[in-house]
C-alpha cells in the first residue's frame, strides 16, 4: 500500500492532469458498473453506458475538477481574522471553501454539467431537450441529496487532505455518488431519490 501511495504521489507531482484524467475516468466507470450491478434494468449489461460514464469522468469532469480544487485552495474567509487563533482561522477558511463548493459548484456547474453532457452522449434525437427535461425533473432533488452527502465529507477533505490529492479522495468517495447519479440519469430507480430526499415520486419522474 505504501508503494502504491508513493507511486501515485510521484505521478500526481509529475503529471497531475493526466493522472487525474485516468483515475477519475476509472472511478466514474466503477460507479456506473456498481449501479448496473446493484440495480440492473435488464439481464444484459450496458457497456456503452459505462463507457459514457468513463468518458465523462476522464474527459469532462477531471480537467474541471482539477482546476476547481486548485482554485478552492486559494479561497479563504473574506473578512479580517486578526484577533482569532490559527485554529479558528483554519476552521473559517475550511467552512468558506465548503460553502463555495456547495453553493456554487454543485448547483450551477457539477449537477447541470453531468445531466447535460450525459444526455448528449446518449445520442438522443433532441439531446438538448432531453437534457432540459432531466434537469427539470432531477436538478433540485439531486442537489438536496448532494447537500445530505457532501458537506461533511468536504469539511474533512479541505481540512486534512493536501490539495493535490483532493480530487482523488473525492473520486474514491464518489463511487457511491456516481452509482446514485447513474441510476437517476437512467431513471430506472427513481425510488432512490424518494428514499433519500423524502419527496413525492410524481415530482421526479419524467
From Swiss-Prot:
Top-level taxon in the UniProt lineage: Eukaryota
InterPro entries registered for this protein in UniProt: Mpv17_PMP22 (IPR007248)
Transmembrane segments annotated in the record for this chain: 16-36, 103-123, 155-175
Location(s) in or outside the cell: Mitochondrion inner membrane
Presence of keyword Membrane: yes
GO cellular component terms, semicolon-separated: mitochondrial inner membrane
Pfam family, one: Mpv17_PMP22
Keywords noted in UniProt: Membrane, Mitochondrion, Mitochondrion inner membrane, Transmembrane, Transmembrane helix
Key word Mitochondrion present: yes
Membrane disposition: Multi-pass membrane protein
Function: May be involved in cellular response to stress. Required to maintain mitochondrial DNA (mtDNA) integrity and stability.
Entry similarity comment: Belongs to the peroxisomal membrane protein PXMP2/4 family.
Protein name: Protein SYM1
Lineage: Eukaryota, Fungi, Dikarya, Ascomycota, Saccharomycotina
Gene that produces this protein: SYM1
Amino acid at each position: 500500500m505504501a508503494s502504491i501511495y508513493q507511486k501515485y504521489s510521484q505521478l500526481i507531482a509529475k503529471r497531475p492532469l493526466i493522472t487525474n484524467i485516468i483515475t477519475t475516468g476509472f472511478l466514474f466507470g466503477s460507479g456506473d458498473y456498481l449501479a448496473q450491478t446493484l440495480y440492473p434494468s435488464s439481464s444484459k449489461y450496458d457497456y456503452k453506458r459505462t463507457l459514457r460514464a468513463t468518458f465523462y469522468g476522464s474527459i469532462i469532469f477531471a480537467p474541471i475538477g482539477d482546476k476547481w480544487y486548485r482554485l478552492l485552495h486559494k479561497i479563504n474567509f473574506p473578512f479580517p481574522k486578526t484577533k482569532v487563533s490559527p485554529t479558528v482561522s483554519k476552521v473559517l477558511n475550511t467552512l468558506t471553501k465548503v460553502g463555495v463548493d456547495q453553493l456554487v459548484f454543485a448547483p450551477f456547474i457539477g449537477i447541470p454539467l453531468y445531466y447535460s453532457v450525459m444526455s448528449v452522449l446518449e445520442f438522443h434525437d433532441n439531446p438538448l431537450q432531453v437534457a432540459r427535461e432531466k434537469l427539470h425533473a432531477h436538478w433540485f432533488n439531486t442537489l438536496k441529496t448532494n447537500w445530505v452527502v457532501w458537506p461533511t465529507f468536504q469539511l474533512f477533505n479541505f481540512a486534512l487532505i493536501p490539495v493535490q490529492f483532493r480530487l482523488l479522495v473525492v473520486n474514491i468517495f464518489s463511487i457511491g455518488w456516481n452509482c446514485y447519479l447513474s441510476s437517476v440519469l437512467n431513471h430506472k430507480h427513481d425510488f432512490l431519490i424518494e428514499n433519500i430526499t423524502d419527496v413525492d415520486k410524481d415530482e421526479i419522474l419524467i
